[in-house]
Every structure is written in C-alpha cells, then in structure tokens.
Amino acid sequence: MTFKYHKVAIVGKHYKKEVSQMVETLYAYLQQQGLEIIIENDTAADTSLVNVAIASLKEIALRCDVAIVVGGDGNFLKASRLLALYSNIPVIGINKGKLGFLTTLAADDNALKNDLYAILKGDSSVTKMSMLKYRVDNNLRAPLEASIALNEIAITASRGLMFGLKVFIDGRYAFDQRGDGLIVSTPTGSTAHAMSAGGPILNPNQNSVVLVPICSHSLNSRPLVISDESVIDIYITDYNDPESVLSIDGRHDTILKAHQKVTIQKARKKVTVLHTKDYNYYDTLREKLGWSKVLF
C-alpha cells in the first residue's frame, strides 16, 4: 500500500526545545519512509537540521499534501488557521503541549510507527472545522490573517468595567447585554473560552455558532446556539470604560470605540483535520476535560 500523502510539511512551536527535538525525530522518521519533507522556516531554524527544504506557511499550504503541526493547542490553532487561508491542506496535530485537545496524536514512537503511519497511508477519519470572520463598521477590515478565527471572536472590556452591547441576528433584534463582554464561538471553540464562560459543548462537525455572555449583569442571561449561516451584528452601546477589545483566538487585539458595529459570520474556509480511523471526539472530552466523569 502506497502513501496517500507524499509531500509532508512540519510546523512546530518556536523556541521550545522539546518541540525542536520532536521535529528532528519526526523528520528522520519521514525520511525513512521515503517521503518529501518541507519544514516551516522558523521551525527549521530552531533545530540542528541542515540542508533541509524550508518554506513559509503560505508556501507550505500551496505546495504540500499535508501539514503536521507539533506543539500545543495554541500553536495548532494558529498554524492550521493560517494554512486554511491559502488552501484546503489537511493538518495532523502531534501534542507537545499541555492539554492536547486538538493535537490528538501522542508524541511517542508508537504514535509515529502506527497512528501517523496509518494516517499518511490514508487510513484516517476527518473533521471539518468551521471558522468565523469579522468586520468593523462594514468597511474597516483587518489583515486577512487577523480576521479569521478557528475558536472564537471575543469582545471584552479593556479594563475591569462593564459595558453595553446590542445584538442583532440576521437583521433582527436579539438582545441587549451589560457585562464584561461576549464570546461568539465555533463548535471547535466551544470547549475553550466559551466553555469556561458557561457555554455548551458542541460537536466540531455541527453547523452552529454559540453566543456566550461574559459575566453578564443579569440573572437571566444565557448562552444562545444559532445556525452558522446567520449574520451577527454587535453594536457597542455604552461605556464605563473608554474602549473595548476584540480578540481572535486570544490574539490580534483590535480596539473598539463606543457606537461601533462588529459583524460576525461564518468564514468560507474550513480547517481539515486528520485523525486516526478510530478517533472518537467523545473519548477526547472524557479523557482531556473529565466530561461526564463518574464520581462514585
């Protein structure tokens, strides 16, 4: 049986010794399999490898068949989101971080020789992860790489003071809120910031978006799950604080002023993630987050 993916990219978290060591191990293993390997520029610079093919993330997305991301969930979020902007290249996550909710392959010999080997042969399962995009006041656009979220888009106070929001969904008034902010999350992000704020867990394959209030000053404010085909308009209404902050997957802060409008909707691109054939999302919920753990 031949490999389904012949040109393989490696992307690692920068300035982390254990990641660099794993990248070197992975490179040697892939070489043994006779595969063509390209390493992301900064990832290669962190290793002792010489005379290797290197490329930017954009070049990797356009030239490679698959990308292996080594690191934690944060690095996976950043790399897979940027790769998806340029092509539909599938990604595989190898965990060298803490939780490893998205980077589902273990960083050990067994995972390389069995799990990764099988995936590269084409014996895998696939998750298509939706993303969100935003614009401010209909015309102020952030650079492309800073306007797409895989986990969530959050609007929060820049200091610890409440502010007001007015939310419309598909052009219809939905609700007002005063509090510390609002999270608009993809199903993938429902186990991240949104979950910490009391939101529901959504399966990554679900075609939904969840709006989760952050410390709403109300006894009856609850998360709201809507179709990912909906368009969400959020107006910044009043302030105790001079400004609020919009962030994407915890990065790329954009300052918002009073009376500005933020429009959020589904992005055209999706992230394609490859797992082992027997991957079970609900196993990951139980094992990584202790979901529905029986206590007695």
Swiss-Prot record:
Compartmental location: Cytoplasm
Residues at which NAD(+) binds: 73-74, 78, 151-152, 178, 180, 191-196
Active site residues of this protein: 73 (proton acceptor)
Entry keywords, A to Z: ATP-binding, Cytoplasm, Kinase, NAD, NADP, Nucleotide-binding, Transferase
Entry annotated with the keyword Cytoplasm: yes
Record-linked Pfam families: NAD_kinase, NAD_kinase_C
SUPFAM superfamilies in alphabetical order: NAD kinase/diacylglycerol kinase-like
Recorded catalytic activity of this chain's protein: NAD(+) + ATP = ADP + NADP(+) + H(+)
EC numbers for this chain: 2.7.1.23
Cofactor: a divalent metal cation
Acyltransferase recorded as keyword: no
Role summary: Involved in the regulation of the intracellular balance of NAD and NADP, and is a key enzyme in the biosynthesis of NADP. Catalyzes specifically the phosphorylation on 2'-hydroxyl of the adenosine moiety of NAD to yield NADP.
Family, per entry: Belongs to the NAD kinase family.
Alphabetized PANTHER family for the sequence: NAD KINASE
Name used for this protein in its record: NAD kinase
